From Swiss-Prot:
Pfam families (alphabetical): KH_dom-like, MMR_HSR1
Residues noted as binding GTP 2 in the record, renumbered to the chain: 212-219, 259-263, 324-327
Disulfide cross-links: none
Domain annotation EngA-type G: ranges: 3-167, 206-381
KH-like domain ranges (all copies): 382-466
Family matches, as SUPFAM superfamilies: P-loop containing nucleoside triphosphate hydrolases (SSF52540)
Positions with biased composition (Acidic residues): 189-199
Organism per entry: Rhizobium rhizogenes (strain K84 / ATCC BAA-868)
Protein name: GTPase Der
Domain of life according to the entry: Bacteria
TM region positions: none
């Protein structure tokens, strides 16, 4: 991306709608409630022939530094300072307010490039607000409708004029963009038999979502990883509303980490905005590969904690538990032993899941947590040679034969791995519909133990093998 643009303005002027328009996706939550956006949300924008990095920000308000609104304002001001250009959005339909004028004065004092955007200019009665925008002293306002996509060519021209043609259209390095080696494993050749077990790619970027109940310490943990106050934190529950992604590097490996809104029990989620936030969290889980579920070590294993883990496993993601606020625990050795016993007992569907005690406030245990994420990702990507699987299947049947149905024993004939991420296997057998669930669990637990696959979802699909003599009998 050649340059960075920050979208700023007071609450509810249409900043997130414009952000979604420019990135071409509904990444930012949009609602009539003021103050929906709280953290900085980055994205890759496309506007006609322009390509640039865009940052959505919280609505700017006059507030004390100690308040939530004051902390949101500090994040927005940081986005302005880091950007090459600011899109200052005002509501042409409603007209200017005292806050608009205060923000315009702040932007003028900074002396950075600014494009004044008069949004909602398609609305009846917007002319007065549009002409009032000239009084802000930030040049000609650019009339647009972010919701309907009107005025985008004018906005493109205003950006090029403000940023300069050379920065807007830097020379392209075609070789850097096209000469990319894509490993075969990235293409996805699921369903093929595996003769050799491919090595784990230590350089592949990791996608990690951080989830949990409200106020479990998710944003604090990510800030500690980054070494900066990138995300809003505080004692107020439910600060995070959007799923925000941040990029950083751990031991030379790129990590894209998603902060998410706290997930409460479904019965308690009644407001439309909170429902949108939870839906956004679910999208983050599905986009991620490894999901870290934050438990509050002082009150662990709430019903909602267990339901979140179950959701992650059902979605097929690799899961890791982080027992946060470990610095508040006194008899740590005894408590850790108790927590691990309860983890295995209460989460049989994720037997062996890695659980790491951490302290997000102090940073204790973060290296151990990252190592657990990498180790779990290795298992989630694991592929096992077909020959090994069939030898294993034969041994399992000797040790514990499948049950008999109507006096005839079910035979498991052949096994192969059909995909990874998560590991999934196909077994060809007789009477697959009669195989009891208890025997399926026996096979899954055996795979976990014998092939070192703790804590990740394992899928087994059964296919009834055809009897070649069946058609002859019917003739």
């Amino acid at each position: 991306m050649s340059f960075t643009v920050a979208i700023v303005g007071r609450p509810n002027v249409g900043k997130s709608t414009l952000f979604n328009r420019l990135v071409g996706k509904k990444l930012a939550l949009v609602d009539d409630t003021p103050g929906v956006t709280r953290d900085r949300r980055p994205g890759e924008a496309k506007l006609i022939d322009l390509r640039f990095r865009i940052v959505d920000t919280a609505g700017l308000e006059e507030a004390d530094e100690e308040t939530l609104e004051g902390r949101m304002r500090a994040q927005t001001e940081l986005a302005i300072d880091e950007a090459d250009l600011t899109l200052f959005v005002v509501d042409a339909k409603m007209g200017l307010t005292h806050v608009d004028k205060t923000l315009a004065e702040m932007l003028r004092k900074r002396g950075r490039p600014v494009v004044l955007v008069a949004n909602k200019s398609e609305a009846r009665g917007s002319d007065s607000g549009f002409y009032d925008a000239y009084t802000l002293g930030l040049g000609d306002p650019c009339p647009i409708s972010a919701e309907h996509g009107q005025g985008m060519m004018d906005l493109r021209d205003a950006i090029v004029e403000a940023i300069g043609h050379d920065q807007a259209f830097p020379p392209r390095d075609d070789e850097a963009e096209t000469n990319v080696s894509i490993p075969r494993s990235a293409v996805g050749e699921d369903g093929e038999e595996i003769d050799e077990e491919p090595a784990y790619d230590e350089t592949r970027p990791l996608r990690v979502a951080i989830v949990g109940r409200p106020n479990a310490g998710k944003s604090t943990l990510i800030n500690r990883f980054l070494g900066e106050d990138r995300l809003l934190t505080g004692p107020e529950a439910g600060i995070t509303r959007d799923s925000i992604s941040v990029d950083w590097t751990w031991r030379g490996r790129t990590v894209k980490m998603f902060d998410t809104a706290g997930m409460r029990r479904k019965a308690r989620v009644t407001e439309k905005l909170e429902k949108l936030s939870v839906a956004d969290t679910l999208r983050a889980i599905r986009f991620a590969e490894t999901v870290v579920i934050i438990f509050d070590a002082t009150i662990p294993f709430e019903k909602q904690d267990l339901q979140i883990v179950d959701l992650v496993i059902r979605e097929g993601r690799a899961a890791v538990i982080a027992f946060n606020k470990w610095d508040m625990i006194e008899d740590r050795q005894a408590v850790l032993a108790d927590l691990r016993e309860k983890t295995d007992r209460l989460l049989p569907q994720a037997r062996g899941i890695r659980a790491v005690p951490i302290a997000g406030q102090t940073g204790d245990g973060l290296d151990r947590l990252m190592q657990a994420i990498v180790d779990t990702d290795k298992v989630w990507n694991k592929r096992i040679a077909t020959a090994k699987l069939n030898r294993w299947l034969e041994t399992q049947q000797v040790q514990h034969p499948p049950p008999a149905v109507s006096g005839r024993r079910i035979k498991l004939k052949y096994m192969t791995q059909v995909k990874a991420r998560p590991p999934a296997f196909m077994i060809s057998c007789t009477r697959s519909d009669s195989l009891p669930e208890s025997y399926v669990r026996y096979l899954i637990n055996g795979l976990r133990a014998d092939f070192a696959m703790p804590g990740v979802p394992i899928r087994i699909h059964f296919r009834t093998s055809e009897n070649p003599y069946e058609t002859k009998k019917k003739r």
